[in-house]
Amino acid sequence: MFCFRKPSDSDIKQYINDRREEQFAYSNLYGTQDYATKEEYEMDPKYSNFDVDQVKIQLGTGVECFQKAVAALKQWKHFDLDWVDFYFKNTPIAVGETVGILSKQVGFWILSFARINYLYDGDQEDGSIKFGYSYGTLKDHVEKGEERFVIEWVRDPDGAPDKGAVYYEMLSFSEPSYWLSQLGYPVTRYFQNKFVVDSCNQMLKAVGSNQNVRHV
């Protein structure tokens, strides 16, 4: 949704309430469960019309880092960016919850809506522990597609709680849903990449890391 003035919090709350029963606005629902890597998506003709993006960074090691990262995700720290307003940060990470993302890009306020459609929470078959979620776009989102946000702790084989890499992963597939998005495709891709970099840095900050991501 393109806006010439910044919507009020009450307007956004009403927009979200109006969309609680709205259907997802893209094909390949739950598609972010299909594969582990970007390369696998790019080999599947089903995703040939989508831009597929993936980044996976190490946040640190051990259970303490994992717990900090999970807490940050639950508080939506990965959206705590100076050019993005997230609505609303008291929203629990639960299937069916709808959220709004507002950003200012090239003179427009862009307001988008997405709904959480599945979760990761607990032990995985490979022995790792994951916490995270996926959300899919609703009508009026400038893109059509789905994105997953996952914290993963690859536990040490010997069970040492202070060992084992902790990762933050984002994977998405998307395509423009408006002619303005298509016309401004390079700008859209710029902001998508900027979001990935800034989100990674917020998660690194949340776990107390001194690392910094400059590009992906």
Curated annotation (Swiss-Prot):
InterPro entries: DUF1990 (IPR018960). This is UPF0548 protein. It comes from Dictyostelium discoideum. Belongs to the UPF0548 family. It holds the Pfam family DUF1990. PANTHER family: UPF0548 PROTEIN.
